[in-house]
Design a protein with these regions (language model features):
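Active-site helix/loop module of the DD-peptidase/beta-lactamase fold
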Residues: 100, 119-160, 189-191, 218-257
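Structured C-terminal helix/loop/strand segments within mature extracytoplasmic catalytic/sensor domains
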Residues: 323-389
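Active-site-proximal alpha-helical segments within enzyme catalytic domains
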Residues: 206-213, 253-274, 327-344
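Peripheral terminal and inter-domain segments
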Residues: 370-520
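Active-site SXXK
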Residues: 82, 99-125, 153, 210-214, ...
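A small/polar active-site loop signature that marks catalytic segments
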Residues: 163-243
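N-terminal leader/targeting segments and the immediately adjacent pre-domain N-terminus
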Residues: 2-3, 12-15, 19-94, 99, ...
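Active-site Gly/Thr loop motif
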Residues: 238, 286-339
Length: 520
């Protein structure tokens, strides 16, 4: 035995075997280092490639971009072998914009939890949740709630009583939390519907507790922790994140990222937690996602499973971060592919995954396809052009209603008044909301498109695109689109003298009736 505690082989045969094994280890290490060098790392920016050079059919991607237009996507990005093979932005969304990713936030928070475990800031996902909040007098703390562990939050099997269905029904409990003054307390105080670990139930409150635990364990705001441990290594510099009234970043939603940066998160998982030779998150954590065991009970075939903020389809070896209105990061390891989608409405996931897998079925480069590439380029250009909504003739009421301030009854939107100027050469609107003062009103104002094409302008950190058209002589349809959030709000305003009735609806399923009275 040598001074390092290693026993030398005792025969020439074993010496030869050991030498061969040593060569294998050395060559394997060299190969691994070579692999790292060969893999494109988009820290400072993504490389682009023709689809066929990466074994992807450009004609199939053209069909996919067209599908995106019909499905109200805001962006579509496909990466194969570490290179972008198509990238489409659907007007009025544009390259370089952040997009609210909704529940894709959960996958990012799950990744941060994995990093915290790897760094020892969270000792184990088996830690009891209540131990992270020793100063709180938690309601219903007796019984099964004491058994609640961080792992249950990560898999949404907390057992807390929570109504946030993955359907068109309103997420009642999530909305209650968002209206409360203490989100963490609201979640912790929920009664138990099941014992922890016994049933999956979609619950953004679970994830808000994970964010709160991260902030407590790391002594950092969750966004700052993300910047230091995840975003900076991946080259993600443009992110915003909603916080609760106490300043804790929302764990279940509220993160905004650019699509290219969303793709980096997916690429990190495709590379099993490594990035340019650096271990960002442990391979064991990636395996926790890739071998998810919690059935989501969606009643679909194939079945979906869940782990650490990610949806998985074991039968297809597909891994997805999924946000409301189809904000998506899709990882297909068998195809060496990552796809990102942002958008404004839900649609079936499985056909999209099948389209992506079929487009990247080839294992080697394909012959150049000039016709297919031209068609793809045409579809991408077409996506960037807004399609005009049909408009009819202007109503004689346009002059009558313009310049008046329409004051609304108290309402959930907080909308106090609306002023329209529809007769100017550049029509405009002005909306005042609760929360401001006479000297400094909380106000949004900007141009309105009356030709079927929306007019975009900055509204704080957001971009608002607005257009209007007459539906007959007394009803004005007013459409405002929060471009960065995928939220479209349509108001049918019916004027009756100095009064107006408004039927408001959003693409998120929210409807409301409002009433206003005009003042000069």
């Amino acid at each position: 035995m040598n001074r390092h505690g290693m026993r030398w082989p005792s025969s020439s045969a074993t010496i030869a075997a050991a030498f061969a094994a040593l060569l294998l280890v050395i060559s394997g290490a060299a190969l691994a280092a070579g692999d790292v060098a060969a893999v494109p790392w988009p820290t400072t920016g993504w490389e682009a490639s023709t689809p066929e050079a990466q074994g992807v059919a450009s004609s199939a991607l053209a069909d996919l971009v067209e599908f995106g237009a019909k499905s109200e996507m805001d962006s579509l990005l496909v990466v194969r072998h570490g290179r972008i093979v198509t990238e489409a932005y659907y007007a009025p969304f544009r390259p370089g914009m952040r997009h609210l990713v909704n529940s894709v936030t959960k996958a990012v928070v799950g990744t941060l939890a994995g990093i915290a475990v790897q760094r020892g800031e969270i000792a184990s996902v088996d830690e009891p949740v209540l131990e992270s909040f020793p100063w709180r007098a938690v309601a219903n703390a007796e019984g099964t709630k004491a058994q609640l562990k961080i792992a249950h939050l990560l898999d949404m099997t907390s057992g807390l009583d929570w109504n946030e269905p993955l359907t068109s029904a309103p997420p009642e409990t999530m909305l209650e939390m968002a209206r409360s003054r203490d989100w963490v307390g609201f979640v912790l105080d929920r009664p138990m519907a099941h014992a922890p670990g016994t049933a999956f139930n979609y619950n953004s409150g679970d994830w808000h507790l994970v964010s709160a635990i991260l902030a407590r364990k790391t002594w950092l705001d969750t966004l700052e922790y993300a910047r230091r441990t995840l975003f900076a290594p991946l080259g993600i510099a443009d992110a915003t994140w909603r916080a609760d009234p106490q300043g804790i970043r929302s764990g279940g939603f509220g993160l905004s990222l650019q699509p290219r940066d969303m793709a980096k998160i997916g690429y990190l998982y495709l590379q099993r937690g490594r990035w340019a030779g650096q271990r960002i998150v442990s391979e064991a954590w990636i395996d926790r996602v890739f071998h998810a065991t919690v059935d989501m009970n969606l009643g679909s075939t194939p079945r979906f499973r869940y782990a650490s903020g990610w949806w998985t389809i074991p039968e297809k070896r597909a891994y997805l971060a999924v946000g409301f209105q189809r904000q998506l990061i899709i990882v297909l390891p068998d195809s060496d592919l990552v796809a990102v989608v942002t958008g404004k409405r839900n649609y079936p996931l499985l056909p999209l995954i099948d389209r992506l897998a079929a487009a990247a079925a080839a294992k080697t480069a394909l012959p150049a396809d000039a016709e297919g590439n031209a068609r793809l380029a045409d579809r991408v250009r077409d996506a960037a052009l807004e399609k005009a909504t049909p408009v009819g003739p202007a109503s004689p009421l346009a002059a009558t209603i313009s310049g008046k301030v329409w004051r609304f009854d108290r309402n959930p939107l907080g909308l106090r008044s609306l002023l329209l100027d529809l007769t100017a050469s550049e029509p405009r609107f002005r909306a005042d909301y609760e929360g401001g003062s006479a000297e400094a009103p909380r106000r949004i104002e900007g141009p309105v498109g009356l030709d079927g094409i929306s007019r975009s302008h900055a509204a704080g950190e957001l971009v608002l695109a607005v257009k209007a058209r007459w539906l007959g002589t007394d009803t004005l349809e007013f459409v405002s689109h929060l471009v960065n959030e995928g939220v479209v709000m349509t108001s049918a305003i019916t004027f009756r003298g100095n009064e107006a009735d408004v039927a408001f609806a959003s693409n998120q399923g929210f409807t409301l009736r409002l009433h206003a009275v005009a003042t000069d």
